[in-house]
Amino acid sequence: MKSSIEPDFWKHKTLLEMTDAEWEALCDGCGKCCYRKFIEGHGKRKKLYYTRIACNLLDLETGRCTNYAKRFQLETDCTKLTKKNLPDFHWLPPTCAYRLLNENKPLFDWHPLISGDPHSVKKANILIKQGIHEKDVIDWFEFVVDGH
């Protein structure tokens, strides 16, 4: 049986041309999209803040969802990133494969599709350190990582 993922597919296919399996394979498993963000201000003064506050389903050690199949039922504000709504997600981290390819940029060497190592994200220190689950947080401002 032929694999549904072609070698180096991201180099010659647009995001819209990718199969569902190829689309899913783009995720490096950093988990950063599962960390809470908030926006402060309006217009030119609007600023996006990233936090160390994770969705309650995120495994903080692996950066993977603990219930990926049912994530939308269990976490009503879970973000569904699709080929059609990708342009709306300008807040994705600059290391995100979806964002990189949408901006016509190459993947980083540590990306599992390049390295061949599913643990390369952790080895490259891309995972957020000292994450905390949302259910354990009282004051979000204590957990701001940076703002853009």
From Swiss-Prot:
Belongs to the UPF0260 family. It comes from Pasteurella multocida (strain Pm70). It comes from the Bacteria. HAMAP family: UPF0260. This is UPF0260 protein PM0539. It holds the Pfam family CxxCxxCC.
